[in-house]
Design a protein with these regions (language model features):
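Bacterial N-terminal signal peptides
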Residues: 8-17
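Bacterial N-terminal signal peptides that target proteins for export
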Residues: 1-9
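Short beta-strand/loop motif that positions the catalytic acidic residue
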Residues: 203-205
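Flexible "cap/lid" loop of the alpha/beta hydrolase fold
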Residues: 109-156, 183, 187
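Conserved loop-alpha-helix segment in the C-terminal half of the alpha/beta-hydrolase fold
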Residues: 207-234, 240, 252
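Gly/Ala-rich beta-loop-alpha elbow adjacent to hydrolase catalytic centers
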Residues: 92-97, 101
Length: 259
């Protein structure tokens, strides 16, 4: 009888060990590659605060510099950086960059998407039309200007008010003067196969966003069943003004999606 108990105990221990091994195999390790995509009227330098935090915490971070000359060029630039990664990655996008990431994120190396005050169109949609669902303060203003060759930019005198109200005047002025003009037709680019339909996603809602209506960001998140994080009082430039909170969301995504 004692022998039978010992055998039973050994069987239980073996079963427990097998169970723990299975869990360990499933648990894996967090994704370490992060690709950051900026939006319209900006460049990659705005990600510096988020970049510093992620790198300090052990992540390998790459920043896409989209030319904004065409939607196809921006998607290609993003895919080019994705291809440089040494494994799976999280794709993070701000503003117009959300549409770019939605199209580029179908790459098999991308295993999750984080939208930061960003557009998130579905197949057959474009961000210009989506923006009409919940018009923003910017869309009702005179701040969007157009060049003779069809590019748009934000009036530097109004940049602080509509894009970066929670930054200092000096920071906003630098962003305004370093902005990359965006080809007007980019906002009308139609999504063919949205990555968020097949991959987990997160949405950072900037509650004081005047460039994209926060209610549109919430609507996008609900439709996509994204994990939603609201950052109270944040402007459209939330990735610049609140880098710690944005980095926390990105790191949460990396921990949630295991290799």
């Amino acid at each position: 009888m004692i022998a039978n108990c010992v055998k039973a105990g050994l069987l239980c221990l073996c079963a427990l060990g097998m169970s723990n091994n299975s869990v360990a195999q499933r648990s894996g390790t967090p994704i370490k590659n992060i690709v950051l995509v900026h939006g319209a009227w900006a460049d990659g330098s705005g990600w510096k605060g988020v970049y510093d935090i992620l790198v300090k915490d052990g992540f390998r971070v790459s920043i896409v510099q989209e030319p904004e000359t065409s939607f196809q060029d921006d998607v290609a630039a993003t895919k080019r950086v994705i291809a440089q990664q040494d494994g799976q990655c999280i794709l993070v996008a701000h503003s117009y960059g959300g549409a770019v990431a939605t199209e580029a994120g179908t790459d098999p190396s991308v295993v999750g998407l984080v939208y930061v005050a960003a557009h998130m169109p579905d197949a057959g949609e474009n961000e210009a039309d989506d923006g009409k669902r919940f018009p923003s303060d910017l869309s009702k203003s005179t701040a969007i200007k157009k060049t003779a060759d069809g590019f748009t930019y934000l009036d530097p005198a109004q940049f602080h008010e509509y894009f970066a109200a929670d930054l200092s005047a000096e920071q906003a002025a630098f962003m305004a003067r370093s902005q990359v003009p965006n080809f007007a037709d980019n906002f009308k680019a139609v999504i063919t196969k949205p990555a968020w339909r097949s991959k987990p996603s997160w949405m950072v809602v900037a509650t004081k966003d005047r460039t994209i209506n926060p209610d549109l960001e919430r609507w996008y998140a609900t439709r996509a069943n994204s994990r939603k994080v609201e950052i109270a009082g944040a402007s459209h430039a939330v990735y610049v003004s609140r880098p710690k909170e944005v980095a926390d969301v990105i790191e949460s995504a990396a921990r949630a999606i295991l290799k």
